[in-house]
Amino acid sequence: MKIYFPKKLLVLFLIVCPVVFVRAQADGKSIIEKAELNTRGKSSYMETNMEIIRPKWTRSVQFKSWSSESNYGLVFITGPAKEKGQSFLKRNMEVWSWSPAIRRTIKIPPSMMLQGWMGSDYTNDDLLKASSVVDDYTHKLLGEETVDGKRCYKIELKPKDGAAIVWGMLLKWVSKDQLVAVKTEYYDELGELVKTEIASNIKTISGRNMPSKLELIPADKSGSKTVITYSNMKFDIPLGTEIFTQQYMQRVK
């Protein structure tokens, strides 16, 4: 038995469907943009403790970080003593490291951006934000779900053609009331879950909502995770581009 649709209904369906798809993309991107601006600001300064947890050992790394927009970033290691003084610089899409032990500045190639940073589950790309979840991905609003008691937007991010991104897909859950990405899942190109990041202890600082604790849990390493705790967070502070230079990264304190 054939089923016939009225011609007007079919035309309306063909018009509305693309509009709904574009609206879902636009809404997804605007939510991600607001969440990024909310947690990063135009500029920022933070002091951080990073705890690397493994089944048989735990160690901590302390560092300071400065950022300006999404183009500039500087990280300075303050502890432990044997690693103190190392610094990492991001300018646009280029990243360098400085080691006082060998007194050398080394440019980090794209192939090393996914290596574990300071032995943690975070990568160089994660810490220095070399890739942008706003500019390097497409965004699709999948719907709403509840995470840890918070009603969230669920958004699918896929890398744009030509973007230097290793992930096949990200899923982000952004809280509706505070616009904070409370959960992020990272998938490889085969669609397998690689790691999950959980954000908690959300605080209001300078009028913006910011998680003061992040947990990154690898999917294939039982008993392993990296916990980041932020303190002394400042946003929208005056930062000149002169601090984001190879010369300054060698003398930052």
Regions found by a protein language model. Name each.
Residues 47-82:
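N-terminal, post-signal-peptide region of Sec/Tat-exported proteins
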Residues 128, 148-246:
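Gly/Pro-enriched, hydrophobic low-complexity segments
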Residues 57-62, 83-87, 105, 169, ...:
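Short, mixed charged/polar active-site loops
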Residues 46, 73-77, 95-99, 105-107, ...:
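Short hydrophobic/aromatic-rich beta-strand segments that constitute the beta-sheet cores
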